[in-house]
């Protein structure tokens, strides 16, 4: 209406004169809107009244509360909050400090699943706890609960005859709703139909759920809600819990594997004066006491190599890295990596270690070397990824020449402007996008992504990168212009990067200076010159090989997840208020189109 009125305002600001028919039409429309609002308000008040009555009436369906769950979620929250407040007024504590648990739900099921239908072990009393996911009444004296926790379900069969009095039975069970966390004291048993249950004589409310819990039958499928309210996702979706158990197993396996090889786990700073160790755009923060900007680490590499200089020959770190770059299905601004550095080794040694670690991890976690993966989601095409060693190995430049069907300049000429122009022309001819700055390194990276990475379904080592793409890697001992580096790709995605480390301080400083020129030319991802690191190299870094793995992507493959948010407990999300502001702006823009004079 406001947009219509705005459109009808005259240039001189005076109100337009409406015809009788138009005035009548508008009054009729306004009356209709008012009647609709009044009717909705009356309906809401009626629902609220019914639900409140159900919440306080102890004779209604033993408090299962279908009337409550038919109301608006906001009204449900109000009703539930009032009920919990009333418990406090009556001297009851809905949030007790402690409840002793004798046995987990998992152990209970394992220990008593052998019982026969109709068994009731009255001589065994146990305490268990969990969250109510369903509540069903069978008459006035028998109530069943589905108690969930630890990824399993146990039935609670509450019978009034097992309580001190029927009044006590009614009182406690009327307090409980779906979503509440309860403690149950009772006996193991099985129903006549063979359902393993705990048969209580006492139930304690440990923490009420004030919000209406979605029904398990419908589940929680909205991804936006799942990622923003991960706790709710975990409550309702058992498969989510399993994904994070697998993620934890991946980290545990890697840590154990490296420990057995004699590596020392270390911790290095997450805030750095100079961001180094990778080609990436950093986050910037500010230190009040030092009165200076600091950079969140993009990689821990340089610190690790300093420790190898100091005589710790085998080091590793599992931790968070931060890169101020895009968010998509495989990238998150903060992510988890494992990096290790091994003195007296080269990239050939690390390829063997990688094969053993990755294939062993897949076999340990899944029971097989083969994993089924759906890159486009559950409804898309399935791929069988075979992690059986040895993995395929290809030379980057040679394979790129085969894929392009043409010979590239000699690798010792890759740093020339002529080579850059040739690669630029190839990208244009092949319709390969490369945002500026169109440096040789970036052009090569885009071509490799377009023609080589897409062929890597099973684990594949892409080896011997050009020096211009690898400022921290050591030059190839037999191929000028290349480095002793490899990347491991699975399902077209990189999961590992490793190389024989550059330990010549003069050469390292020269490469840093070339990176500085690239940064000056507009490449935000180019490296800074790190003088402290160069000084450390001057004390002598032994022949060393370094390795890094993206834990999140490995977790994606082993949990069959095509979105990195599925394997991050709390992924980066745009704030909801910001989203609302954007939506409001869009709405305002759409309603004011054509209204300008």
Curated annotation (Swiss-Prot):
**Impact of altering residue 346 to R?**
Induces protein aggregation. Releases from the subunit complex
Q: Give the result of residue 105 to H, as annotated.
A: In CMTRIB; severely affects enzyme activity
The organism's place on the tree of life at top rank: Eukaryota
According to the record, the protein's activity is controlled as follows: Up-regulated by DARS and EEF1A1, but not by AIMP2.
Query: What UniProt keywords are attached to this protein's entry?
Result: Acetylation, Aminoacyl-tRNA synthetase, ATP-binding, Cell membrane, Charcot-Marie-Tooth disease, Cytoplasm, Deafness, Disease variant, Host-virus interaction, Intellectual disability, Ligase, Membrane, Mitochondrion, Neurodegeneration, Neuropathy, Non-syndromic deafness, Nucleotide-binding, Nucleus, Phosphoprotein, Protein biosynthesis, Secreted, Transferase
Sites bearing N-acetylalanine, chain numbering? 2
Q: Which residues carry this modification: Phosphoserine?
A: 207, 590, 596
The residues that hold ATP are 323-325, 331-332, 494-495, 550-553
> Which residues are modified to Phosphothreonine?
591
InterPro entries per UniProt:
Aa-tRNA-synt_II, aa-tRNA-synth_II, aa-tRNA-synth_II/BPL/LPL, Lys-tRNA-ligase_II, Lys-tRNA-ligase_II_bac/euk, Lys-tRNA-ligase_II_N, Lys-tRNA-synth_II_C, NA-bd_OB-fold
Instruction: Name the reported effect of residue 207 to D.
Output: Phosphomimetic mutant that strongly enhances translocation into the nucleus and production of diadenosine tetraphosphate (Ap4A). Almost complete loss of tRNA ligase activity
The EC designation for this entry is: 2.7.7.-, 6.1.1.6
Describe the reaction catalysed, as an equation.
tRNA(Lys) + L-lysine + ATP = L-lysyl-tRNA(Lys) + AMP + diphosphate
Effect after changing residue 189 to D:
In LEPID; does not rescue the developmental defects caused by KARS1 depletion in xenopus
Which HAMAP family does the entry mention? Lys_tRNA_synth_class2 (MF_00252)
Query: Tell me, how does this one assemble?
Result: Homodimer and tetradimer. Part of the multisynthetase complex (MSC), a multisubunit complex that groups tRNA ligases for Arg (RARS), Asp (DARS), Gln (QARS), Ile (IARS), Leu (LARS), Lys (KARS), Met (MARS) the bifunctional ligase for Glu and Pro (EPRS) and the auxiliary subunits AIMP1/p43, AIMP2/p38 and EEF1E1/p18. Interacts with AIMP2 (via N-terminus) and MITF. Interacts with TARSL2.
Its UniProt domain note says:
The N-terminal domain (1-65) of the cytoplasmic isoform is a functional tRNA-binding domain, is required for nuclear localization, is involved in the interaction with DARS, but has a repulsive role in the binding to EEF1A1. A central domain (208-259) is involved in homodimerization and is required for interaction with HIV-1 GAG and incorporation into virions. The C-terminal domain (452-597) is not required for interaction with AIMP2.
What is the similarity comment for this entry?
A: Belongs to the class-II aminoacyl-tRNA synthetase family.
Q: What is this protein called?
A: Lysine--tRNA ligase
